[in-house]
Amino acid sequence: MGSQLALKSRIHSTESLAKIFNAQEMIASSHIAKARDVALNAKPYSDAIFDAVQALVAHTHITHPIAVKDENNPRVAVLALTSDRGMAGPYTSSIIRETESLLSRLDAAGKQPELFVYGRRGSTYYKYRNRDIAATWEGNTDQPGVEIAETISDTLMDAYMKPAEKGGVSELYIVYTEFINMVVQKVRVLRMLPVEIVQNETKVPSPDEAAPSTADIAPLYTFEPSLEKVLDAILPKYIQSRIHECLLTAAASETASRQNAMHTATDNARNLIDDLTRKLNASRQASITQELTEIIGSADALTKKEE
């Protein structure tokens, strides 16, 4: 009887958890379409800014901080984009794992990484382990706005433009999760500054192939009023657009990861309920069989006694 009560209690608690998991899955499902569309809509603007920066760096000989790293400054900024809430599967743990790997590689290279964290789960993880954190931001990791992107970009810009003797950094890295589709989300490490030139693979076309289109050729720009002023103006826009794009694709990844995790948790809870129900029924059947056996045995004993 006691085992049956324990099984009933476990079934009841598991049913309650299944309802919570299913509700979380439905909420994530209602948010994922918007999160995906917002991330995709932000990409063209970010790509256009990046193309302009690429043109600045590739077609001019400049010594601006946007393109030239201070080799004498070993300090490096690393921004990790985690989540505020749990129940998102391996989302935050994957970011932390990749961040730790990046920090180890930077340490091995003689760098001095400074950690910046976005998301309550990440900041809690590092604070619990007494790790030094330069700055943290929390709130709405699954629905980030332009304001938080501006705040983060301003902080990182100040750190990057600050002289080395005043604690400035020579490189900016961001660790985030890129949304590929509902099933696949990949952790990426992006070096935002100094800007790296992305070389498109080119080949000599054969006689039967068409010549490369103008879309494959880097555009030419005229910089007014001057190259230096254009660089100063475009640098904060570049940082903000890249961070905003990373925040949005990370938010879509978090929502997709949460939906997948809650779907799996709901299925596991239902499977556990079925398993516990079978055990409960088997226990009931055994109890009934035992009672019937005792009744029959008692009846036989009484019959023999009367004879």
UniProtKB/Swiss-Prot annotation:
Cell compartment(s), UniProt: Cell membrane
GO BP terms: proton motive force-driven plasma membrane ATP synthesis
UniProt xrefs under SUPFAM superfamilies: ATP synthase (F1-ATPase), gamma subunit (SSF52943)
Domain of life: Bacteria
Record keywords, A-Z: ATP synthesis, Cell membrane, CF(1), Hydrogen ion transport, Ion transport, Membrane, Transport
This protein's record includes keyword Endoplasmic reticulum: no
Residue ranges of coiled coil: none
GO-annotated molecular function: ATP binding; proton-transporting ATP synthase activity, rotational mechanism
GO cellular component: plasma membrane; proton-transporting ATP synthase complex
Record-linked Pfam families: ATP-synt
Protein's membrane topology: Peripheral membrane protein
UniProt-listed HAMAP family: ATP_synth_gamma_bact (MF_00815)
Family recorded in the similarity comment: Belongs to the ATPase gamma chain family.
Quaternary structure and interacting proteins, as annotated: F-type ATPases have 2 components, CF(1) - the catalytic core - and CF(0) - the membrane proton channel. CF(1) has five subunits: alpha(3), beta(3), gamma(1), delta(1), epsilon(1). CF(0) has three main subunits: a, b and c.
Stated role: Produces ATP from ADP in the presence of a proton gradient across the membrane. The gamma chain is believed to be important in regulating ATPase activity and the flow of protons through the CF(0) complex.
Protein name: ATP synthase gamma chain
